[in-house]
Amino acid sequence: MNKMPIPEIYVHNDIEENLNKLGWKELEGYEGEAFSNYIIKPILEEQLKIINDHIGEYKDEFIEKAINKLINEPKPEEILDYIKNGILITLDKGRKGQVSNRVKLIDYKNIEKNIFNYAHELKFKGNDNIIPDFTLFINGIPIIIIEAKREFSEKETYEEAINQINRYEREAPKLFNYVQFAIVYGDEKLYIPTYPNEEKEDRFKKPYKWKNEKKEEDIWDLLKRERVLDTIKNFIFFSKDRAGRKTKIIPRYMQYWAVKKAYERITNYLNNKDYKNRGLVWHWQGSGKTFEILYLAELFYNEFKNKDPIVFIMVDRRELETQFNDDIIALQNANFKDCFKKINSVEELKGVLEDIKESENNPNISEKGVYLVMMHKFDKNKLKDFIESFGSIDKKEILILRDEAHRTESGKFATLRNKILKNAIAIGFTGTPVHKKDMSTFKEYAYPQEGEFYLDRFFIEESIKEGFTLPLIWRVVKPEDIKDISEEEIKNIIEKLFVDEEDADKIVVSKKEIAEKIKLSDLLKSESSIKEASKYIAEHILEDTENFKFKAMVVAQDRKSCILFKKYLDEYLKEKIKNYNENWTQVVITYIHNDDVEIENYKKEIEKKYGKNVDELNKKWTEDFINKENPKILIVNKKLLTGFDAPILKTIYIHQFLKDYLLLQASARANRPAKNKKYGLIVDLTGILIENYKKAIENYNLYRDEAINKDILNNLFVETSKIWESFLTKLNEFKELFKLIVGIEFDDFIVNLKKQKNSKEFKKIISKIILSDKFDYFYAKLRELIQLFEAVGAYGEKLNYYETYEWLKIISAGINKQMRPKSYKIPYNQIKKEVIKYLEFDTYADIASTSINPQLLENLKNKDEINVIVADMIYYALDTLQNKKEPIYRMIYDRINELKNAYISKTKKNEYVINELINCLNALKTYEEEEKTLSKSEKAIKNMLFYLKNVENCNIKKLPLTEKTLKNLEDKKLIKPSDFDKIKKFLFVDLKNAIKETEKRRKVSNKIVEEIIKPIFI
């Protein structure tokens, strides 16, 4: 054998030595055969006789026809299928009829029945004869080539080796009908998929490093004989990319090992070696979770085919469903495709479940399949009657593969799924697991109570290091006008927020109050903020996208903000870019029935303009963003923040308050690798997200540290079954307490209200509860039960208790509404209206709609609704007054609080309490009416005199110096701290005759200024 000259000879010797160690045997004497036919026919014939011992009669003829078919087949996809599954051959035997057999080319079960050879510098026929450094054969079929370069050479690098392999694919395309992948061995040890390039296309194929199970770089681990067979059988496929071009799928090391760990969990469970039937694959964006799911589906289907395996690929968004469906349709060489189906309706799901259950009871029915299904098909309401008669499926050979497993996993859909498929195996995939009190990805898919948080982890730093995602650069842009907001600006903000309020001009809040109440998310919705952000984007977009070599995304606070961004970006980009047109920017948002008028008008506008409905437009613009020139900028709110894979996207402008997993998911849209793309750019237009990002990364990295994991385990995770047992015990205790307070059984209460739907009856019961001396204990028990139920996530046993849970929440909502009814006087509720939409008060929406009305008490004194009304009035008044600081309000508040205690303790007669309550409410109503006509100085004087009389026992009629100073203060636009110091001095003088003791007078003066005057004027 001719050897390469020094120094390359050392590289080649190293390769030969390692191949020999792995059980590959050097091939000699077949150069001519390989040169003409690409395969080594004598070896193949001999091996096929050995591995096809299932064929009896006509074996030689079957084998001859199979070899001829293999040699003459022009399509690499078909040849890969032959290599994976064998070749089906049919012989026509005249009167005997047709005889069929599948001729195996490789024995995947019995590795030693195959022969593994390597050849050094073997020539292959092509337009130019090519000579790979090494060719690896299995049973005479060329499967792998190795191209070697000197490790320490400026000229001979791995890039040169890759270019050489690409040239081979063009010059000897038929060889690559058989060769499945190539190894690059030089300054880097890499592997790439290979396939013919007869069209001589300019291809971009990313080379990968291989790491062994310990995550140590080791290309020889990939070339182990068992690894090669496993990879070919279960992990290599042909497909088409989104542009319709042929491509070849080959596993990356983290995909392979994650799938193998998940498969080990599956086999141990099905072979009764372990009770564990779930697992979490925690892999960051760009690691290829879609194909991890498809690999595992194929592996499970292939290995358990004789047990009628069932696979449910579950997603929770239409975009993901479409993506998976398209990817599976494009996939070739996957055996599971023979029985793949997308479940389009709840009725179809019922049919599939019924077929599976019937196959359990009837051995003559074979039911296997791979199903793509939306989580929302497991709808308790739509499946209620079905489930009552159907029950559960006992079959264990059911695999649930759940993408984006951090979402939709603690509610009714997951609970119902787990109830029906009670013995199924569930493997969850996510880049951002969630751990909150009511939802924990770790608890749903792992065994944290046993120290297992995941089967496999591949997070951000590993992804960037391996080149599967790019580094992210953050640019923080802090709006200047928020640095030192003035009182006038506060006034303007209030006018915008409450423009439709009748009393908007009377809403006066201090700088401190507005800072506490108005959140960043509210400010990010303001038109002025969006306008300024759009101006900034227009000024930087060309630089940030490299003159639109790449594309951009704008993430807005809400859907209305998206439309405003479109308006202002069009305006400012038109000024900056000469050839700009409005198709460069498009809004991709969700539209709902009865949308706000601005969104509805925009919807009508674009549907008319483009002649398509908004769903079609969203789909078109999303696809065009990836594959076409326009749009160049997508404007989004929630859509596309997760699961959107667009390597062309480089820059994301974030004008939304994001944190935790959603921030990580959103930022990951920018760092997908693309040709000549060095990094992803995040422009933080809020000024604070970078700290949120760092915190989220730190939180996730906690789960890598074994010591911290142990601490987390001890402090945060409790076995779900124990939580459930606690829930059941405490539910029984709660029911006994309910009966003690209300006088009826809890279950009877539910039955009666379901029949009557009587809100008055409900209010009576709520009032009894509120006015009971056991109320605090009752309410604590109620909240604890709700929290325990939510804490068990998608635990299957929950399903039978959902109605109980709903009624617990209704009671809680009823108590909250009766104790804290909404008041038009508190404008901050409007600021938080988006939050209020999510409160679950649908069932009894009209229960607590009472306003303060003393006359109502007079009219109802002798009616049985009195308990309800007293409870309403007391708690409404207390809630309304509790944040009021003026002495008049405080005095009324304290008196009503005394009446509440007297009413509950029964130390005063009902009539006395009611009469006193009427007096308080009348006084409150009178002062509220009077307050509307008072200036700030008049309001301050009235409250000071009230305080001095009722608290300090000073019967003083006038405070002349103080009053004059306050009136002057009222005309000032800017109030300084020194102004309040001046008031203290004048008040100290005014009180000279009323409070003789100097120190006490100073304290009273200071207290009045701090607690009465300042809150009114600031």
Swiss-Prot record:
| Documented EC number(s) | 3.1.21.3
* Keyword vocabulary terms for this entry: ATP-binding, DNA-binding, Endonuclease, Helicase, Hydrolase, Nuclease, Nucleotide-binding, Restriction system
Which biological processes are named by the entry's GO terms?
DNA restriction-modification system
- Which principal EC class is assigned to this enzyme? hydrolase
Tell me which stretches of the chain form a coiled coil.
none
InterPro entries given for it? Helicase_ATP-bd, HsdR_RecA-like_helicase_dom_2, P-loop_NTPase, Restrct_endonuc_type1_HsdR_N, Restrct_endonuc_typeI_HsdR, SWI2_SNF2, Type-I_R_enzyme_R_subunit
Record has Nucleotide-binding as a keyword: yes
Region forming the signal peptide? none
Q: Name one GO molecular function term.
A: type I site-specific deoxyribonuclease activity
What name is this protein filed under?
A: Putative type I restriction enzyme MjaVIIIP endonuclease subunit
Q: Which organism is it from?
A: Methanocaldococcus jannaschii (strain ATCC 43067 / DSM 2661 / JAL-1 / JCM 10045 / NBRC 100440)
> Mind giving the lineage of the organism this protein is from?
Archaea, Methanobacteriati, Methanobacteriota, Methanomada group, Methanococci
